[in-house]
């Protein structure tokens, strides 16, 4: 594992300016692969969704997937790119076991989309423009699984297994121009940019956009230069970072590592790096290749593709509401304040709250549950809130039980814990745990008498008009009933008992 010396982030920022660059690979959710009729299905038995084209058998010819081209154009349009009138595929030559043809069919100097931009909103509302160099089509490689090692990497593994189901799956690679001027907000910008790309492709419906499945993967490039210098430093590329937090942490770590190398008077090596989530460090991969090393040349088996302006405009007309406009609409519909809505977006639960409202919850109740209960649990479990396993219908059911007086908020929180533990539905958990609210006034009056007897001075204050002191008595009753009393009803009974009008 990594033994790199690193500088503190603050010290690195005092001395250097970071320059970032991202290559985000988006798997398209087409029914078949990019150049073959083999199914594009995640999770099937290894090496079952493969045919002779994917394996590069002699004499086979590729056929371009039209839906993949349409999806690529839609992505380009959503990224404010220009769509090339003519583009072509190229062969990217390299040998690796997950590439059965010994080349990848990609695009080189004639991509389908180019010269775009994305305006990225940071957590405090600051907008940072990221310029897009290009978005090009290519096919994915197979998947290698390294067995016997401690880290899951090839280093130290006893052997490797290869699954070609992913070989030939259509990809769009989105490449940014160098990103300058982010300063100490570079890690935050990295996370926000990848989140924005993921949101766009999910909104377009062209990708499942599940990072944990590899539908969206990010290669993060980092270099540093001393303050005031224009020339870029040597960059490293951290490959296949597959979560938003990992992107943020990887960029932060690489900034600290580069700063330590430069401070020691040593050269930064242009290389790929591997990210390790458990230690939140990177380790060296291989020397970074330049384009010349891949010996690109035009794909001889595919003719250049012409995207007529009429076709492009037809596709533009099918684009859904852009995410930024959707957020503006939802904020107005839900009546959230600027701060409330920004917190929802930053927590990554916008879709979940929308689904919960669609399932029947009010906007305030949906926000209360996701922000007040679920986000905290997700942080404790170190997962994204949407991956915690809570369904919108569950939130609606819990909220209805509270509204109907069957359980109180404290009990509802316990029921949620039971749902996450797999104990059953909310109704089943309430019954199993005996969590129903005490609705009979008899037991409540007994608990109230005991609480008043234990705190006669508080009872006198309430009789004397200091009604706010009632909280101590209510607390005693709630403790005696193990939180199963209706606090509102308890308060009413206490005031009646003491002959006080609220």
UniProtKB/Swiss-Prot annotation:
From the Swiss-Prot or TrEMBL record, what is one GO molecular function term?
Answer: glutaminyl-tRNA synthase (glutamine-hydrolyzing) activity
Q: Which PROSITE patterns is this protein grouped with?
A: GATB
Its domain of life reads: Bacteria
Record EC number: 6.3.5.-
Q: Which reaction does it catalyse?
A: L-glutamyl-tRNA(Gln) + L-glutamine + ATP + H2O = L-glutaminyl-tRNA(Gln) + L-glutamate + ADP + phosphate + H(+); L-aspartyl-tRNA(Asn) + L-glutamine + ATP + H2O = L-asparaginyl-tRNA(Asn) + L-glutamate + ADP + phosphate + 2 H(+)
Q: Which GO terms describe its biological process?
A: glutaminyl-tRNAGln biosynthesis via transamidation; translation
Chain segments annotated as coiled-coil in the UniProt record: none
Report the InterPro entries cross-referenced here.
Asn/Gln-tRNA_amidoTrfase_suB/E, Asn/Gln-tRNA_Trfase_suB/E_cat, Asn/Gln_amidotransferase, Asn/Gln_tRNA_amidoTrase-B-like, GatB, GatB_Yqey_C_2, Gln-tRNA_amidoTrfase_suB_CS, Gln_synth/guanido_kin_cat_dom
Keywords from the named record = ATP-binding, Ligase, Nucleotide-binding, Protein biosynthesis
Database matches in SUPFAM superfamilies: GatB/YqeY motif, Glutamine synthetase/guanido kinase
- Pfam families (alphabetical): GatB_N, GatB_Yqey
Keyword Ligase attached: yes
The family line of this record is: Belongs to the GatB/GatE family. GatB subfamily.
Q: Which HAMAP family match?
A: GatB (MF_00121)
Instruction: Describe its assembly.
Output: Heterotrimer of A, B and C subunits.
Main role?
A: Allows the formation of correctly charged Asn-tRNA(Asn) or Gln-tRNA(Gln) through the transamidation of misacylated Asp-tRNA(Asn) or Glu-tRNA(Gln) in organisms which lack either or both of asparaginyl-tRNA or glutaminyl-tRNA synthetases. The reaction takes place in the presence of glutamine and ATP through an activated phospho-Asp-tRNA(Asn) or phospho-Glu-tRNA(Gln).
Q: Supply the NCBIfam families for this chain.
A: gatB, PRK05477.1-2, PRK05477.1-3, PRK05477.1-4
Q: What is this protein called?
A: Aspartyl/glutamyl-tRNA(Asn/Gln) amidotransferase subunit B
Q: What is the lineage of its organism?
A: Bacteria, Bacillati, Actinomycetota, Actinomycetes, Micrococcales
Give the gene name. Answer: gatB
């Amino acid at each position: 594992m990594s033994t790199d010396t690193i500088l503190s982030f603050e010290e690195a920022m005092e001395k250097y300016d970071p320059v970032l660059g991202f290559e985000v690979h988006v798997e398209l959710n087409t029914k078949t692969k990019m150049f073959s009729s083999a199914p594009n299905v995640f999770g099937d038995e290894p090496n079952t969704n493969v045919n002779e084209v994917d394996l590069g058998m002699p004499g086979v010819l590729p056929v371009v997937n039209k839906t993949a081209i349409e999806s690529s154009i839609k992505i380009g349009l959503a990224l404010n790119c220009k769509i090339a009138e003519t583009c072509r595929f190229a062969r990217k030559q390299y040998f690796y076991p997950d590439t059965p043809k010994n080349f990848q069919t990609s695009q080189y100097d004639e991509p389908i989309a180019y010269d775009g931009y994305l305006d990225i909103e940071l957590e405090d509302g600051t907008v940072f423009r990221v310029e897009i160099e290009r978005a090009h089509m290519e096919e994915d490689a197979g998947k290698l699984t390294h067995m016997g090692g401690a880290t899951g990497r090839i280093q130290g593994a006893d052997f490797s297994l290869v699954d070609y189901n992913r070989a030939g799956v259509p990809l769009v690679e989105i490449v940014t121009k160098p990103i300058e001027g982010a300063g100490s907000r570079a890690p935050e910008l990295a996370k926000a940019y990848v989140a924005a790309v993921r949101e766009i492709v999910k909104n377009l419906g062209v990708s499942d956009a599940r990072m944990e499945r590899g539908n969206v993967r990010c290669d993060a490039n980092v270099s540093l230069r001393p303050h005031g210098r224009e020339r870029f430093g040597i960059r490293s590329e951290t490959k296949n970072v597959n979560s938003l937090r990992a992107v943020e942490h990887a960029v932060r770590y690489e900034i600290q590592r580069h700063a330590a190398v430069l401070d020691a008077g040593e050269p930064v090596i242009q290389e790929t790096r591997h990210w390790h989530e458990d230690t939140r460090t990177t380790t060296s991969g291989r020397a970074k290749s330049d384009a010349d090393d891949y010996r690109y040349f035009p794909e001889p088996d595919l003719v250049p593709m012409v995207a007529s302006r009429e076709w492009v405009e037809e596709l533009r007309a099918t684009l859904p509401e852009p995410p930024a406009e959707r957020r503006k609409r939802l904020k107005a519909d839900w009546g959230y304040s600027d701060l409330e809505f920004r917190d929802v977006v930053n927590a990554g639960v916008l879709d979940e709250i929308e689904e919960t409202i669609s399932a029947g919850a009010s906007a305030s109740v949906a926000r209360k549950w996701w922000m007040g209960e679920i986000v905290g649990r997700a942080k404790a479990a170190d997962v994204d809130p949407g991956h915690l396993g809570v369904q919108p219908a569950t939130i609606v059911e819990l909220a209805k039980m509270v509204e109907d007086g069957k359980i109180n908020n404290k009990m509802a929180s316990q029921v949620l814990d039971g749902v996450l533990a797999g104990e059953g539905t909310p109704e089943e958990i309430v019954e199993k745990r005996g969590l129903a609210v005490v609705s009979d006034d008899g037991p409540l009056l007994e608990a109230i008498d005991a609480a008043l007897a234990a705190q006669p001075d508080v009872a006198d204050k309430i009789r004397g008009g200091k009604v706010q002191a009632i909280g101590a008595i209510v607390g005693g009753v709630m403790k005696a009933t193990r939180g199963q009393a209706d606090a509102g009803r308890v308060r009413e009974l206490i005031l009646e008992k003491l002959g006080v009008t609220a």
